Amino acid sequence: MSNYWLNIYKPGGISSAKLVSMVKQILGKKVKVGHAGTLDVEAEGILPIAVGEATKLIQLLIDSRKTYIFTIKFGLQTDSGDYTGTVIATKNYIPSQEEAYTVCSKFIGKVTQIPPAFSALKVNGVRAYKFAREGKEVELKPRNITIYNLKCLNFDKKNAIAIYYTECSKGTYIRTLAEDLALSLQSLGFVIELRRTQVGIFKAENAIRIKSPDEITKSFLEEKSIKIEAILDDILVLDATDSQAQQIKYGQKCIFDYEDDISLLWVRYKGTLLAIGSLNKNCFNSLRVFNVL
């Protein structure tokens, strides 16, 4: 089995790229490996890793909903939005428990967010955080995101901290959300702990934890692998005949006996993922074709 997903739990203190490198070291240098969504170095949590042909589906997973649990420290603001940064502002006001809980409703729905300067977004081909580290100002464009759920799990007035849970769309920066929450509460705040608990179908409770490539074998990862089609379970699937499979493989016109137009579906051949694409007037238009024939 060479095309699959791995549900990996990234510990804090290492980069997403480093974790991918560790997996590649275990599986072999020739194996194609990629991850579905960068996590901050100091953050921990779910980092889905695609192996082989699964890398062609990474964007679909990046587009899926994600859940996080994060802790805000009130009364201070840092340049990075988390505890690794330098304090740039302070405010004595600490919100009440009631305020910390009720503010959540203001953020549920479509929200405009300005990404933090300390982010991996590129500005003129250079990562924004590189400019930020040099003390240079970077203008990042606001982006539209969606907060599907936001709630306060715990509030500690004495230590001026609150723990929140959120379910959000792609492109959401939790550090920015935390700062905006604090500002809405007439205070300041930054993230002192961040954990991603779910990405699409991948959840923290059944994730693989890797501390060192020396302690995990290739066979162990393969045993824990998740089929490539798993992330497509809620998408329409059509079964291809031998002739249809050949047409799709070679980029030829392929007609299916299906009345509705479909913006995204996948085609299965002999029980295996063959392609993803759309259907327009019975004609299948491939977005990605997988090397399974």
Curated annotation (Swiss-Prot):
Molecular-function GO terms, alphabetical: RNA binding; tRNA pseudouridine(55) synthase activity
Recorded catalytic activity of this chain's protein: uridine(55) in tRNA = pseudouridine(55) in tRNA
Enzyme Commission no: 5.4.99.25
UniProt keyword terms in alphabetical order: Isomerase, tRNA processing
Residue runs in coiled coils: none
Active-site residues, record numbering mapped to chain: 40
Gene3D superfamilies (alphabetical): Pseudouridine synthase
Pfam families: TruB_C_2, TruB_N
One BP annotation, GO: tRNA pseudouridine synthesis
Family indicated by similarity: Belongs to the pseudouridine synthase TruB family. Type 1 subfamily.
Function of the molecule: Responsible for synthesis of pseudouridine from uracil-55 in the psi GC loop of transfer RNAs.
NCBIfam families, alphabetized: TruB
Protein known as: tRNA pseudouridine synthase B
